[in-house]
Amino acid sequence: MTSIIKLKVFSGAKDEGPLCYLLQVDGDYILLDCGWDERFGLQYFEELKPFIPKISAVLISHPDPLHLGGLPYLVSKCGLTAPVYATVPVYKMGQMFIYDMVYSHLDVEEFEHYTLDDVDTAFEKVEQVKYNQTVVLKGDSGVHFTALPAGHMLGGSIWRICRVTGEDIVYCVDFNHKKERHLNGCSFDNFNRPHLLITGAHHISLPQMRRKDRDEQLVTKILRTVRQKGDCMIVIDTAGRVLELAHLLDQLWSNADAGLSTYNLVMMSHVASSVVQFAKSQLEWMNEKLFKYDSSSARYNPFTLKHVTLCHSHQELMRVRSPKVVLCSSQDMESGFSRELFLDWCSDPRNGVILTARPASFTLAAKLVNMAERANDGVLKHEDRLISLVVKKRVALEGEELLEYKRRKAERDAEETRLRMERARRQAQANESDDSDDDDIAAPIVPRHSEKDFRSFDGSENDAHTFDIMAKWDNQQKASFFKTTKKSFPMFPYIEEKVKWDDYGEVIKPEDYTVISKIDLRKGQNKDEPVVVKKREEEEEVYNPNDHVEEMPTKCVEFKNRVEVSCRIEFIEYEGISDGESTKKLLAGLLPRQIIVVHGSRDDTRDLVAYFADSGFDTTMLKAPEAGALVDASVESFIYQVALSDALLADIQFKEVSEGNSLAWIDARVMEKEAIDNMLAVGTSNLMIDDKNREEDVNDQEENGATEGEGNAEPMEIGENGSQESLAISESGKEVENGHTNDSRTKKGTKGKIRGNLILDPLPKRLIPIHQAVFVNDPKLSDFKNLLTDKGYKAEFLSGTLLINGGNCSIRRNDTGVFQMEGAFTKDYYKLRRLFYDQFAVL
């Protein structure tokens, strides 16, 4: 493994916050998820901004806000332009998640982080992929990645990132190996000992119930609530795990023996109808056992949800009679309908709230889960049911605030009207200037009074005006300097409209293409349509004030309220994540070379790390970073990228090893680009001076007889490996030979710091060490025997030894894999040896 692999953790390490990691593979930067939670912290976005121009791709694993909630912010506010890759369901359901989150906040406060238009712009950058589809990263790095099923949410993915060298990097967080009603479980059969495994420890230490017991408990809790004339709220997400529960409850309502058909089942979110519609069109991403056929052999869509009523507002929910069961978003209860309904229903002891997941500890849902667990243990006190909440509402303006709003609105409307009229005036002036040429050509027709008295049939005078086409024609003729041979006669006035053009051609007028149907004036309708007798109310268009309802001015208020939770609180886990014991066994079975544990509380992370350590895993290859840490996952500790200089490329002699692969032996030294530029900038003048000085030194040595003795010659220093040491570069950019430098302040043997822009430059010929020949290839003796036969030699095998020409020469391979050739020193021997050498690439 010679790749540079690093992981920068921005968020989602040793906590339950959103997930965001930056993976570096050589020169490519891949962003793994970009989530956001209800706190909307901007700290990790500020840390990520310097890396955004370097990002080559963004990989999204799941559609919920914890995995992609920050994508619109990165695109709209941080300038992210890299392509985003996600599966088709993650693309569609991810939009539903973000839409619902934005609408939920706009209902109670001003949400300024991004708008719905920003959401649409961000998702336009998403490139949709399918499972097992290989996507090659743009560029020549050879990095490609594949999405595999995660089993947690519809379209959820485990990403496998590969290089051309074959090493795998697996990013798997929030996966489920168990098959559910609407999803298949994940599978790790396609992974063959990855080089790096990036995994999560989310809730790995918490026990899970059996699926059958969990479903029975859910039905029991619902029945106990609705039979007491209470309403039951099931807190669930927007477009992920809600599909599992909606399908389960729809089946229960279809079963008459369950006793639930007399009650109403509601699915409530701002995008409920869109979520169900998308689910109907994505059956190929679901469990194959989900498909059923009725008696007519027609395919039945399992997400028709005949017993589920879709609601998008409180007004629609109020029309559904109680008792009712409501699947309500959002899951953490920090915003959305779940928080609003809880404030309305928590004071009634007949109502019930069922929580299905463990969100972050700062949320309202986490407090209620803790309350439910304490109630089951019998240690919940009355004062524990009192909780303080921040209530946010949007209320209508009244009194002075309403008058002030109307005054400002009138000023804005007046200003907009003035600007609109000004634009219209300027446009009219522009049109008049365009038609000025036509006005000069057309002859004006001047109205005048008739010289005669016109009388009507009843003898009365009529002072009506008349238009004489010949009036003042002679006066309107323009004098011309040149004599005209053809007389021009007056015509009826016609001003040809100037055709307007833009960058795309002639401007199209929609009214020119309007199809006018034949109208029967007696009936007032089309002839092709049948005559229908309508009531008077239907024929006349009566203005309905509800058709143009003016949006009422509102303001956002926020206050603290202490509420008593009198309703029943239950927790039934429907999170869809593998249990801790199964997760540990699955991850250990992958036999990864390195593991980075993220996305989990400190206790869960410590538990998973301890399991790997107890299993005999190398603890030096096991990392559990903090948020903001940089993890180096490269095998070699010191790997640097260098470029080949033009001088070195000119001297390299490649030898083909196999088809498309060539090798070459190089003798070079590592230098900084600035040092080479300085050497080239010196020019030939310094070279001439050096040559002159060298000649003078040689002459002086000859005169002094220094060349005859060897006592003054310094011995050549030999490296530890027996070869002569090459040149290095000191911190100041000067050449250092064998640990010495011209700068007396530099100590012998001190290594310079490695900087960027490193270049391999040819080693001077006097410093090139002698190396033994290297034979590259692994030929087969059977293939060489066929070659000898084609050349006219007699060759045969005897006990694994290739005998040539009756044993005059033999070639065999010993136990260590080394070829041995024996024979008499004849011309044939040297020919055979040369022929055998040709099977290798000799460097």
UniProtKB/Swiss-Prot annotation:
It comes from Caenorhabditis elegans. Residues 414-425, 732-746 have a biased composition (Basic and acidic residues). It comes from the Eukaryota. CPSF is a heterotetramer composed of four distinct subunits 160, 100, 70 and 30 kDa. Residues 432-441 have a biased composition (Acidic residues). Belongs to the metallo-beta-lactamase superfamily. RNA-metabolizing metallo-beta-lactamase-like family. CPSF2/YSH1 subfamily. One of its GO terms (biological process) is mRNA 3'-end processing. GO terms for cellular component: mRNA cleavage and polyadenylation specificity factor complex. SMART domains: Beta-Casp, Lactamase_B. One of its GO terms (molecular function) is RNA binding. This is Probable cleavage and polyadenylation specificity factor subunit 2. CPSF plays a key role in pre-mRNA 3'-end formation, recognizing the AAUAAA signal sequence and interacting with poly(A)polymerase and other factors to bring about cleavage and poly(A) addition. InterPro entries: Beta_Casp (IPR022712), CPSF2 (IPR027075), Cpsf2_C (IPR025069), CPSF2_MBL (IPR035639), Metallo-B-lactamas (IPR001279), RibonucZ/Hydroxyglut_hydro (IPR036866), RMMBL (IPR011108). The keyword Cell membrane does not apply. It is found in: Nucleus. Its main location: nucleus. The keyword Ion transport does not apply. Residues 414-443, 691-753 are annotated as: Disordered. SUPFAM superfamilies: Metallo-hydrolase/oxidoreductase (SSF56281). Keywords: mRNA processing, Nucleus, RNA-binding.
